[in-house]
Amino acid sequence: MPEWALYALAAVAGYLSGSIPFGLVIVKAAGLGDIREIGSKSIGATNVLRTGRKDLALATFLLDSLKAGLVALAFTLLAGREVGFVAGFAAFIGHCYPVWLGFKGGKGIATYAGLLAFVSPLHGLVVAAPVWLGLFALTRISSLAALTAAVAVPPGAWLMGERNSLILAGLALLSVFVFWTHRENIGRLLKGTEPRFGAKKKDAPEA
């Protein structure tokens, strides 16, 4: 198969995998209604947590991670790390803009985590995870932790010796997308109104 065809196949497969709306399916299966009518209306794990079911939120996070990670791993084994990264990147896009839901999906953090875990695990473990966990522990603001981790990954990967231009460019572009999908959160962060985990509902706007 020509190289361009492998990249195209990876992109299509990744997008279709990423566009599976696990959050929507899980919440409906649990009899809790349409997640798109709850909280921020996002299909991601953070919004699923607003149903009060931590188990459903965890399941959503894991499945959203795997739908990017497994397709990325499959194409990495089939055609190399660059093609695998393209598949995972496309899964991120599919999650954020699923064709089945009118291109209105989640914010991409779980799929980003899945991509890192299966294609660049060292960058995820050494850079993304400690930054997210550390900042979340300090602030209890999930969006701030996610945005900071997204910013840290590209330079962190470079400092750790990553020199593949496609991977570095892709990581930088993913950071841009994360900021875009979190633009409403950024607005609230600037106003000081972004909710913290554990805050009383009456004091916490929708994230």
Swiss-Prot record:
E.C. numbers: 2.3.1.275
Top EC class, one word: transferase
The protein's assembly and partners: Probably interacts with PlsX.
Catalytic reactions of this protein: an acyl phosphate + sn-glycerol 3-phosphate = a 1-acyl-sn-glycero-3-phosphate + phosphate
Subcellular location: Cell inner membrane
Protein name: Glycerol-3-phosphate acyltransferase
Organism of derivation: Hyphomonas neptunium (strain ATCC 15444)
TM region(s), chain numbering: 7-27, 58-78, 83-103, 116-136, 141-161, 166-186
Family: Belongs to the PlsY family.
Pathway(s) of this molecule: Lipid metabolism; phospholipid metabolism
InterPro entries registered for this protein in UniProt: G3P_acylTferase_PlsY (IPR003811)
GO biological process: phospholipid biosynthetic process
Gene Ontology cellular-component annotations: plasma membrane
HAMAP family documented for this protein: PlsY
Molecular function via GO: acyl-phosphate glycerol-3-phosphate acyltransferase activity
NCBIfam families reported in the protein's UniProt record: glycerol-3-phosphate 1-O-acyltransferase PlsY (TIGR00023)
Keyword Transmembrane helix: yes
